[in-house]
Amino acid sequence: MEVAGHVLSAEDLEPQKGVLVGLHKNLEDSAFVKLPFDRVARTDGNGRFCIKGVAPGNYRIYALKDMDGDFRYAPGELLAFSRDTIVPRAIADVRRDTLWRDTVHIDTVKLTPITRYAPDDVVLLSFTEKRNSRMLLKTQRDVPEWFRVYFTAPSADVPVIKGLNFDEKDAFLEQRNATGDTLTYWLRPGSLLEQDTLQMAYTYETTDDSTGLAISRTDTLELVPRLTFAKRAKQKAEELEKWEKQREKRHKRGDFSNEQPPKEYLTFGKGLAGTLSPLGNVHFSFSEPPARIDTAAFHLQLKRDSLFEDAPFRLERDSAALLDYTLYAEWRPGQEYELTIDSAAVTGLYGLENRKTTQSIHIPSEDSYGALFLIIPDVDTTAVVELLSGEKTVRRERVNARHGADFFYLNVGTYYVRLFVDANGNGRWDEGCYAEGRQAEEVFYCPMHFDVKANWDIEQTWHARELPRTQQKPKELIKQKEAGKATPKSRNAERAAAKK
């Protein structure tokens, strides 16, 4: 007998090619880890598999990207599992073949007895388990002002630094990245900053190889910057010498316009944009942690006719980031704003100051945007709806109590929609865990696309669970394309072409 179906990625319903799918007669969970499969097959370009030669009985089914070739699951390998018991069976069926007398009239309908095997619609959703094993991966110190420590996984534990050739008290500002697995330590100004080599005992949480439990470990670190103060001073001297030579050439031409020697300023990163959505805000990412911000030196003005008037705003640091700040304001559609930041409005931790910056900000009118209003009856407020432009997430909204998700102020374009059921309420999609018997959080795609036009609202009811997963993801978004099947005729043509 046969068992057939599909393997899709649990995160984006992408067909999984070349994945091993196997059956176990042993129904214990441990069989997937300890025993090789009894019967196996591999998926094709559409993610479809067909396991043949299956004896009658009860089975558990799994999918596995078998990296080590032992037909068993090992941590780090892509997997999929089902709690359903697979019972292969043969079903007597009839195939109808129509014989035509001519192009208009049917001669006979031939009925041919066939045997169909079930189940043939198994859907396995694959994922790679989140890596919980935490190790110190590497350290990095490019410049004297900071050093960075990389881990393989995040931890709520705060590492402890004990200086071996310096006093560690109030010596650093700690910054974590968004995923929590990389820590950056900014050195506070003082004698420590002038010290090329930092020697420390670094105590952190790691995972014991034998038990898999979290333990505390202390490593001795010796950190030397790649670019020392001496090298930096040499570079600046070379830049100044180059500038002075260029100034002499300008003077010979009678050009005295640029008399200010090069100076290093605090930068804002990707910050200021000329056009902003009414739902957007202005983001700053400073080149070093700000030590002082004078909000009185920030001026946001709304243009009325030919005059500007002050507009209220609020400048706040992003929750977990030392460098990132956001300027919030009530952006009115169809209006023009001007943001001016005076020189020295922001002073960095190491004394750098910003230069004066002025940026015009245009807020397009409401009729230049479209809107999309979705009603999704078969999900609740745990669902998070993502609006996609291609595979890029443009916007996300949690389903409200009315089973709706509303997207305002959309730019003209083609959009797709997917949702995931945020079972643990952390606001992001999470993979499953085989040891806990937990599947990855459910993902659904709307099979249609939405062409958003200016000054146009789209209202659509979408039953997320109506179609099987294999029919949900729009073809335009599927990256894995099945190669055309080779036929004897095409092979002969290829051989003939090769001989030429």
Spans of features found by a protein language model:
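N-terminal targeting or signal-anchor segments and their processing/structural boundaries
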Residues: M1-K500
